[in-house]
């Protein structure tokens, strides 16, 4: 297929957290608020002149300093983020929205605050650490509303004069929903037998929507949607099998590129920094305040294995099965960041439950933060592709008989 018009520009935006569009927005007077986790409600970080930047540490080579302050058996994602912060890579931020979800990420942001990683002369800068409930009932919704109001909206309003009213929240939701509609429409094309977009390209599109100001990335996403609608696909399919990828943080699209180079087209992205969850519309009604509805939406749509209530576990398993069915995947790859506590449990359980209860063939892996060039991972994915092909062959032979 012909390369997407803006793909190379999008890739350049992913080379640095302080990318060109972030710099442009700040030059125009906007305020960047950093976050890492789905549980820090993204849409509430985009009120008024504020815009969210989901933190990444592209091109990480060493984590020695972060390992000194944390531990060599702590999550590599968290260590990479702390390392980049200590290098001064996030000095452009005006606030940092943390969450008390996983210990490693919590410790990373705590160290940022202790060592003043935000830089000097930032009296208005604030850190927050939201206490996230383990379930999604109305008591939990009330709790997270109080946390967000006190720890995010109040300092935004008092430190920077940001409008945090109900009308401002609804305006932010409207802009957020347009991003979601565009990415959903593009993503739906992956259900086709010969999609007009690859998993790698889609991962790049989703990532830039997380790390760039919405108002500046939206025109480029609109153009890309129009381009995908009319894109001519290759006559021959360029994949051998279709897979869903499920798991923890994938903020490096080169991992998706590696999987696809083995012949497995990634048709569903159910991982942190992917489109499931995070790129679905938030539907608001007029009968309740917007803040409560937004907080409820994030609690009810999280797919983090920290949510240990039984109905949440069932929800996650059912959703993966639904994605595999809807996107016509031949199997699923469950991946976890090395040393991730919650996903280590989820991945092991899924290794038993998904084949047994749902008939879904899976590959279960743990991986380093930078995995795009991993020879061992490539070998395992290649073997998985071959096993899926053998499964298809046996099924075809059974039908013939």
Question: Where are the language model's segments positioned?
Answer:
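Redox- and metal-dependent alpha/beta enzyme cores, enriched for Fe-S-associated oxidoreductases
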Residues: 27, 38-39, 44-56, 247-312, ...
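Short, charged, surface-exposed secondary-structure boundary motifs
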Residues: 61-70, 138-140, 275-283, 373-376
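Acidic/His-rich segments in extracytoplasmic proteins that coordinate ligands and/or metal ions
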Residues: 80-155
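Metallocofactor- and cofactor-centric catalytic cores in central/energy metabolism, strongly enriched
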Residues: 12-22, 26, 34-43, 62-66, ...
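TerminUS-proximal long segments
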Residues: 317-324, 329-331, 335-341, 346-401
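Glycine-rich, highly charged phosphate/nucleotide-binding loops
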Residues: 69-87, 308-320
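A charged, amphipathic alpha-helical module
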Residues: 1-31, 146, 150, 154-281
């Amino acid at each position: 297929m012909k390369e997407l018009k803006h793909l190379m520009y999008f890739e350049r935006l992913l080379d640095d957290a302080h990318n060109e569009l972030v710099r442009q927005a700040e030059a125009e007077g906007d305020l960047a608020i950093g976050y890492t986790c789905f549980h820090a409600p993204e849409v509430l970080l985009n009120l008024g002149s504020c815009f969210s930047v989901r933190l990444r540490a592209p091109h990480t080579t060493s984590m020695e300093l972060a390992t000194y302050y944390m531990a060599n058996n702590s999550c590599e994602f968290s260590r990479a983020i702390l390392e980049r912060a200590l290098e001064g890579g996030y000095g452009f931020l005006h606030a940092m929205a943390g969450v008390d979800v996983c210990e490693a990420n919590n410790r990373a942001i705590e160290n940022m605050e202790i060592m003043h990683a935000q830089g000097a002369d930032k009296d208005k800068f604030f850190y927050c650490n939201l206490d996230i409930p383990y379930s999604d009932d109305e008591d939990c919704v009330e709790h997270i509303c109080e946390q967000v109001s006190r720890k995010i909206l109040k300092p935004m309003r008092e430190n920077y004069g940001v409008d945090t009213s109900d009308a401002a929240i609804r305006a932010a939701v409207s802009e957020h929903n347009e991003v979601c509609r565009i990415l959903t429409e593009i993503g739906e094309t992956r259900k086709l037998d010969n999609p007009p977009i690859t998993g790698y390209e889609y991962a790049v599109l989703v990532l830039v929507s997380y790390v760039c100001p919405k108002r500046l990335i939206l025109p480029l996403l609109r153009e890309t949607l129009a381009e995908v609608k009319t894109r001519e696909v290759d006559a021959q399919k360029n994949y051998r099998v279709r897979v869903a990828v499920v798991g923890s943080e994938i903020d490096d699209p080169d991992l998706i590129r590696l999987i696809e180079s083995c012949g497995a087209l990634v048709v569903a992205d159910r991982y942190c920094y992917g489109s499931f969850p995070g790129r679905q519309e938030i539907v608001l009604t007029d009968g309740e305040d917007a803040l409560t509805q937004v907080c409820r939406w994030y609690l009810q749509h999280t797919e983090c294995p920290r949510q240990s209530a039984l109905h949440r576990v069932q929800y996650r398993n059912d959703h993966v099965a639904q994605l595999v069915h809807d996107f016509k995947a031949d199997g699923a790859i469950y991946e976890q960041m090395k040393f991730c506590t919650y996903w280590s449990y989820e991945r092991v359980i899924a290794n038993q439950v998904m084949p047994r209860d749902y008939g879904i063939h899976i590959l279960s892996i743990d991986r380093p933060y930078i995995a795009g060039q991993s020879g061992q991972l490539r070998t395992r994915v290649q073997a998985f592709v071959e096993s899926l092909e053998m499964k298809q062959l046996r099924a075809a032979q059974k039908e013939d008989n």
